[in-house]
Amino acid sequence: MGIGVLIIGDSGTGKSTSLRNFERGEIGILNVAGKPLPFRNDLARLDNARYNQIHQALMKDSLNAYVIDDAGYLLSFDNFRRAKENGYGKFVDMAQSFEQMLEAIAGTSADTIVYVMMHAERDADGRIKPKLIGKMLDEKLCVEGLFSIVLIARNIDGRYVFETQTDGLTPAKSPIGMFAEREIDNDLKAVDTAIREYWNLKPLGGESDG
C-alpha cells in the first residue's frame, strides 16, 4: 500500500518549487495544468495529465515517488468541461473520480510515495483546507483525513517552509518524531528522505516492487 502525502498551500507559497532538489529518474511529475516548473531542471514530466493518465502511471508504478501537481485542477477542469450539465449527478461523478484517484495512490507498492499538491482555501472560521469543488467532496469526503501526512506550504517573511504540525487553524499533521521541527524548509526531497528513513522504505530512485 503506497503512501500519500497531501501538500496544501496558496499560490506562490513554493509548492512546485519544493521539487527543485530532485534529480531526473527520482520522481514522476504528473503536471495537471501543464505549467513549466519554476526552476531550471531536466525532470521528466507528463504535462496536462488527466485522471486516466495518472491512473496508468500509478498502475505502472515504475518509480517509487510521484507528484500530482496540482490535483485541484483535475476538479476544476472537469467542472468546466461539464459546465452545461445540471443536477447533482455531475458532482457525484466528480467526487467519484477524485476518490478513485486516491484509491489508485493507495494501490501503489509499499515503497511508493505520492505527493498530492492542492491549493488552499479557508472556511468561515479561517481554517485552511484543500480547495475543492462541490459539497460532496467538501462535506462527505474529508480529503485531508485520508492522508497520514499533510504539509502546509507557507511563505513567512520570504522564507518558504512546510508546516508539519497544526497550529490549530490548519490540518497539518505528521507522525511523531518524523520531522525535527514544526516548520521545515520546503525541500520535498528532504521530506521524502525523512519519510523513507522513518518507515524503512527503499531509498529514492530505487525501482518499485509494483
Residue spans of the language-model regions?
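Short, well-ordered beta-strand core segments
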Residues: 27-29, 114, 150-152
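P-loop NTPase motor core
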Residues: 70-142
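Structured loop/turn residues at beta-strand edges in well-structured enzyme cores
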Residues: 61, 110, 145
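Conserved nucleotide-binding/hydrolysis micro-motifs of P-loop NTPases
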Residues: 24, 33-37, 71-73, 120-124, ...
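Solvent-exposed polar/charged
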Residues: 20-21, 107, 145
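Conserved, well-folded catalytic cores of nucleic-acid-processing
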Residues: 58, 74-77, 150-153
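Conserved P-loop
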Residues: 1-61, 65-68, 72-73
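Conserved GTP-binding G-domain of TRAFAC-class P-loop NTPases and closely related GTPase folds
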Residues: 123-210
